[in-house]
């Protein structure tokens, strides 16, 4: 090797090492591994007591998280679940779309339950896009037009807001805090665009502008450049936790399209929704419910339209936090979990709501997908038509038929309950680190 090459090589190594060592801490991520409602909020609440910053990276108030802290039940839609920890900073990242009236309504409701000093603990990205009331009107109209082929949207305006973002006529939080005349011009322009496409929507432009002028001073204390804030925090060794909204099977790219949400709720959305490079990611925690649920329409291979589905729905109190709709229920689906693990790269799993299975004499787990001709699939179907042509092959495991609700040590769980957990581990080749057997954070068992 020439002297010049050696110098260049050493220079590269030094630069590479410098970049690698630039961050003194890692970002840990909590992601839903199914169709949402897995209990991510409770997991984040448990982990938030040990971190400095908790972030939301995508979605809007179409997501719903319930956290029980000190006997009080908090419902969050836009706020990260970490806000219940008063020592923690909560960040709403650039990938989130924000309906300001809903955000402040959520703040007031949770302050009434005891949440305090949010102004000092909540940061909103200046690059996050705004959801307006007309986005919500459009969402409802588009859903109604689909008739019997509706997608089951929450009608919160999330899809139309992301559409505005993609077509480059959306408005960001930072623009609201700048020159209000420019904001007004942009608002009138986006309203006119939507009126041309949807003439029946009702928008009082002057009233809306007056309302948003009032929001300027209310939202200003929360807003800053979250990208710079997070990178500075990592360089200073601050611990960061990201709370994914929705779940992998609702991802716009990897979910059961078109029965999906409008954002990337897999690992990629964490990076783009917060402005983080891949090397900052540490643990990726997949949250898996011990059975499967889904809100709204769309394919659901292991769904049980029988007494088992009814029992899971009743015992699990499967009602959507955001929609208040009953969730569809079915058995655990291994092919689905293998697929989302492939996409997200889970380093460990938190298995939730194991106690809901306590009364069952036997428990089925979907282990293979087969076509109607008997051929086994080695992949998760990419189209709805392909997915509708599959049959599920089940493994039957013995139940434990005793309450696990008050157990706090993994080795004290009934043997068959432990075997259920180990079966999931062996199928996915991913360790189960925690098991949930109740509502509160104290009901999460550390397996190891």
From Swiss-Prot:
InterPro entries: Adenylosuccin_syn_GTP-bd (IPR018220), Adenylosuccin_syn_Lys_AS (IPR033128), Adenylosuccinate_synth_dom1 (IPR042109), Adenylosuccinate_synth_dom2 (IPR042110), Adenylosuccinate_synth_dom3 (IPR042111), Adenylosuccinate_synthetase (IPR001114), P-loop_NTPase (IPR027417)
Top-level taxon: Eukaryota
Primary site of residence: cytoplasm
EC identifiers of the protein: 6.3.4.4
Residues annotated as catalytic: 37, 65
Single annotated GO MF: adenylosuccinate synthase activity
UniProt record, GO biological process: 'de novo' AMP biosynthetic process; IMP metabolic process
Annotated residues for binding of IMP: 37-40, 62-65, 154, 168, 246, 261, 325
Binding positions for GTP per the UniProt entry: 36-42, 64-66, 327, 353-355, 436-438
Subcellular location: Cytoplasm
Pathway as given in its UniProt record: Purine metabolism; AMP biosynthesis via de novo pathway; AMP from IMP: step 1/2
Binding site for Mg(2+): 37, 64
Name of the protein this chain belongs to: Adenylosuccinate synthetase
Organism encoding this protein: Drosophila mojavensis (Fruit fly)
């Amino acid at each position: 090797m020439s002297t010049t090459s050696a110098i260049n090589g050493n220079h590269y190594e030094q630069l590479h090492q410098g970049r690698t060592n630039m961050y003194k801490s890692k970002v840990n991520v909590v992601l839903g591994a199914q169709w949402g409602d897995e209990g991510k909020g409770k997991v984040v609440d448990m982990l938030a007591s040990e971190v400095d910053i908790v972030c939301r990276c995508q979605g809007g108030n179409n997501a719903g998280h319930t956290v029980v802290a000190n006997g009080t039940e908090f419902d969050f839609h836009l706020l990260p679940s970490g806000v219940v920890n008063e020592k923690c900073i909560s960040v709403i990242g650039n990938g989130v779309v924000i309906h300001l009236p809903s955000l402040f309504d959520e703040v007031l409701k949770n302050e009434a339950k005891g949440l305090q000093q949010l102004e000092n603990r909540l940061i909103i990205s200046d690059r996050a896009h705004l959801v307006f009331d007309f986005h919500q009107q459009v969402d409802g109209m588009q859903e109604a037009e689909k008739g019997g082929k509706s997608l089951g949207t929450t009608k919160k305006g999330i899809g139309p807001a992301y559409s505005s973002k993609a077509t480059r006529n959306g408005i960001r939080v930072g623009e609201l805090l700048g020159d209000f005349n420019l904001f007004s011009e942009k608002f009138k322009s986006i309203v006119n665009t939507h009126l041309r496409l949807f003439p029946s929507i009702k928008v009082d432009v002057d009233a809306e502008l007056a309302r948003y002028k009032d929001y300027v001073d209310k939202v200003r204390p929360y807003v800053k450049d979250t990208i710079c804030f997070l990178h500075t925090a990592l360089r200073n060794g601050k611990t960061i936790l990201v709370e994914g909204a929705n779940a992998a099977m609702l991802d716009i790219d990897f979910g059961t399209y078109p029965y999906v949400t409008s954002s990337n709720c897999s690992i990629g959305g964490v990076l783009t929704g917060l402005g983080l490079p891949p090397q900052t990611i540490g643990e990726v925690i997949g949250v898996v419910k011990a059975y499967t649920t889904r809100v709204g329409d769309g394919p659901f291979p292991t769904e049980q339209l029988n007494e088992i589905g009814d029992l899971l729905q009743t015992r699990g109190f499967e009602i959507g936090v955001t929609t208040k709709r009953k969730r569809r229920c079915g058995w655990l689906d291994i092919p689905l979990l293998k697929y989302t693990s492939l996409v997200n790269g889970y380093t460990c799993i938190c298995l939730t709501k194991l106690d809901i299975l306590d009364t069952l004499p036997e428990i089925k787990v979907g282990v293979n997908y087969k076509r109607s001709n008997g051929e086994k699939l080695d992949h998760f179907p990419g189209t709805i038509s392909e997915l509708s042509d599959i049959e599920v092959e089940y493994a039957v495991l013995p139940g434990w038929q005793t309450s696990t609700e008050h157990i706090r040590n993994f080795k004290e769980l009934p043997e068959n309950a432990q075997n259920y957990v180990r079966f999931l581990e062996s199928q996915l080749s991913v360790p189960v680190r925690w098991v949930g057997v109740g509502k509160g954070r104290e009901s999460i068992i550390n397996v190891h």
